[in-house]
Amino acid sequence: MDSNTVSSFQVDCFLWHVRKRFADQELGDAPFLDRLRRDQKSLRGRGSTLGLDIETATRAGKQIVERILKEESDEALKMTIASVPASRYLTDMTLEEMSRDWFMLMPKQKVAGSLCIRMDQAIMDKNIMLKANFSVIFDRLETLILLRAFTEEGAIVGEISPLPSLPGHTDEDVKNAIGVLIGGLEWNDNTVRVSETLQRFAWRSSNEDGRPPLPPKQKRKMARTIESEV
């Protein structure tokens, strides 16, 4: 196993521990708590994949961070902060909408790279809105936290989420996953629209009303793809 992979995991575990202590003091805002919850799942998945104990890794990560801080000057810290581009966290959903459990009568699921696409194929003839929480850097989607499909009544009928065990995805990965989700939902004569935030950063080929134009052949192909891979 590559030593950099192990040390990276150890540092991530310790930094998560620090953030958790911060959150336990009720100092974190909604985006902070959201990322904390997602990163916990990611660390569990990575730990399982690597065969490493999280508690042991956290202690090792603490030693690495302490050594770095001991060698770091205030001036070097200022230069590092100034040179790192800042990302923005954008939210369509409330914390309640993100954490709410939902159930599918006719579940369909597809794994596309490091993203998991889920939808309820029992939903028909509904107006559906796609909402997402994600970070943006250089005016492009950086990391998808969670995307969900909501009916006008507020029911959740679809979802795109990163797989904890496979971190890392591009804005194109997210766009392709959105296309698959839309194709599956529109197959049952649902009308799907995308939030303004998603239109701007993750789905630029939308119509003015926020409804992505998908040809019938593409919709059928996407729906068949989902069914064949479940």
Swiss-Prot record:
InterPro entries: NS1, NS1A, NS1A_effect_dom-like_sf, uS15_NS1_RNA-bd_sf
Residue ranges of the region described as RNA-binding and homodimerization: 1-73
SUPFAM superfamilies: Ns1 effector domain-like, S15/NS1 RNA-binding domain
Residues covered by region (CPSF4-binding): 180-215
PTM annotation, UniProt: Upon interferon induction, ISGylated via host HERC5; this results in the impairment of NS1 interaction with RNA targets due to its inability to form homodimers and to interact with host EIF2AK2/PKR.
Subcellular localization(s) per the UniProt record: Host nucleus; Host cytoplasm
Keywords: Eukaryotic host gene expression shutoff by virus, Host cytoplasm, Host gene expression shutoff by virus, Host mRNA suppression by virus, Host nucleus, Host-virus interaction, Inhibition of host innate immune response by virus, Inhibition of host interferon signaling pathway by virus, Inhibition of host PKR by virus, Inhibition of host pre-mRNA processing by virus, Inhibition of host RIG-I by virus, Inhibition of host RLR pathway by virus, Interferon antiviral system evasion, RNA-binding, Ubl conjugation, Viral immunoevasion
Source organism, top-level taxon: Viruses
Short motif (Nuclear localization signal): ranges: 34-38
Quaternary structure (record): Homodimer. Interacts with host TRIM25 (via coiled coil); this interaction specifically inhibits TRIM25 multimerization and TRIM25-mediated RIGI CARD ubiquitination. Interacts with human EIF2AK2/PKR, CPSF4, IVNS1ABP and PABPN1.
Entry protein name: Non-structural protein 1
Gene source species: Influenza A virus (strain A/Seal/Massachusetts/1/1980 H7N7)
Gene that encodes it: NS
